[in-house]
Amino acid sequence: MKRRIFTYALTLFALSASAYDITDLKDLPDHPEKGKWVQCIKVEAPRIHADLTTATPLSFQAKGMSRILVRCGKHILTPEGVNLDSEGRGRVTLNPKKLPAGPINIQIIADNAKKECDIYELQLWNAATKTARTEKGMPKDCPAVAKGMKLDFYDDFDRGLSISKDGRGARWNAHKPTFGDFSGWPFCDPSDDTDGPFVLRDGYLVIQARKKPGTRGSTGLLAPVDMDGKGYWVTPPFYMECRFMAQSAPGTWPAFWTITNIHRGPGDELDIIEAYGGWGEKNPNNTGYFTTTHYWEQKDENGKQLPGDDKLIKTDKDDTSWSQDFHTYGVYVDKDSTVYYRDGLPVHIIATNAMSFENKHVFLINYAIGGASGWQIDLERYGNRSNMYVDYVRVFTQH
């Protein structure tokens, strides 16, 4: 896990305040790459991580902006635009009956003629409806890629959470075994605090990143192996997947990944998804996510460090990103190929390294905030609060 340095075109879904046809998101204009990102959007209500129980006004200010789009996943909430007053204040009614149940992310996207732009992601919980979210919960069927395999491990977070500070006596370890925690806001032990790193709600594991005044902050990591190396390891061939959603904001760094070695020395690391949040100067400005393969401390035939593999998986305009909605991220490993998946479809394939096939893997799920990524942390306008919502994780194997 380390910082990725990259520059990509910045994609902004920006709409004028007048009426328009939004039947196809591909028709929405791209924002110029050299747009100036500014933090101008302020949400006045509802509060961050609030429950929606009835129709609720979304009140915000986007001073200096002229074009606004408000969306929830693929749902466009402002089909007739947003009228802003002279101070840039706007108001949109959030109707929970028209939104998915459970965790949702409301995106407010703004720009102006000066090419200034901003994106604000408001995480809420729709508690007013039982409207099914597509594919919510762990499917009963085996995914096509795992046909012929058996379900070897799963957690759908419907049965309580068994986790301890070192993994001993529990299903989950709250730290990376056996060394190497890497988050700027530290991965912390489980606690009964309502703002602690782990909370279960309605079949979701909520990993809560928080920074209270006077603290270094806190966030969460899960690994099914304890500090003695005991627990769940999977032997190739295997397929594993995890379904989650997080927030894109400066410093957020959700990931689902595997390692073959929990001690120092040679080992492979498969980053099934490594996502970097945040827009603007000194931020990733990334509309996709990475699949990354590391071959730690391994030499090629010339005695040089064996190069890894790094692939940006871009999010199309007519799709949703890792912060806009839930998606399932997976990896299949056999002797010949390592194939990365998103929502059951292959997105990247490489030849399997010998160490990946000949060794067992342990997987990790985490919501890092800054740290080894190298990206700045700036969650002040979110009250230094951000959540990652994990629906389930499961592993299939031939053994």
Model-derived regions, located:
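Short, compositionally biased P/S/T/A/G/V-rich stretches that sit at domain boundaries
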Residues: 20-51
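Edge beta-strands of extracellular beta-sandwich domains
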Residues: 116-127
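Aromatic sugar-binding surface patches on proteins
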Residues: 84-93
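Conserved structural position at the C-terminal beta-strand
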Residues: 108-110
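GH16 jelly-roll
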Residues: 96, 129-399
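Short proline/glycine-enriched turn/loop motifs at strand-loop junctions of beta-rich domains
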Residues: 61-67, 333-335
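Surface-exposed, short loops/turns at beta-strand junctions within beta-sandwich domains
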Residues: 94-103
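Aromatic/hydrophobic beta-strand junction motif of beta-rich domains
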Residues: 50-52, 56-62
